[in-house]
Amino acid sequence: MPEQPDGIWIIASDARTLFANAAMAEILGVPASELIGKPSFDYVFPEDAPAAQKLFDSKQRGDTNPFRFKLRRQDGSPIWVDVQGTPMRNAAGDFIGIVGTFSISARQE
């Protein structure tokens, strides 16, 4: 199986999508243009929302540790991804969002 390119997802401090590349759109099963402005939590299963919020909050505090997470594709199916997220800050040091790379996990949970 050929290696898939990583998805890149840039998420604002209010969790809205600022940018998603074609690979990220493919992971989520939605056109990239439809992701812009959409809440990133729309792609999280409701039962996983508290864990997703904790991860988002940890990135806001500066955590850069990678993690594995289950996303909800547009068709409702689950997909496990390995995520490397880095907080973005403005010149004043204020948190403005997260840039993340997402790769399809070789191992399903």
Sequence positions of predicted segments:
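PAS/LOV and related PAS-like sensory modules
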Residues: 1-13
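PAS/PAS-like sensory domains
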Residues: 6, 58-68, 82
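PAS/PAS-like sensory domains across diverse signaling proteins
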Residues: 14-16, 26
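PAS/PAS-like sensory domain cap-loop motif
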Residues: 24-35
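PAS/Per-ARNT-Sim sensory domains
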Residues: 45-57
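PAS-family sensory domains
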Residues: 70-76, 89-90
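Short loop/turn elements at sensory-signaling interfaces that couple input to output
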Residues: 83-98, 104-107
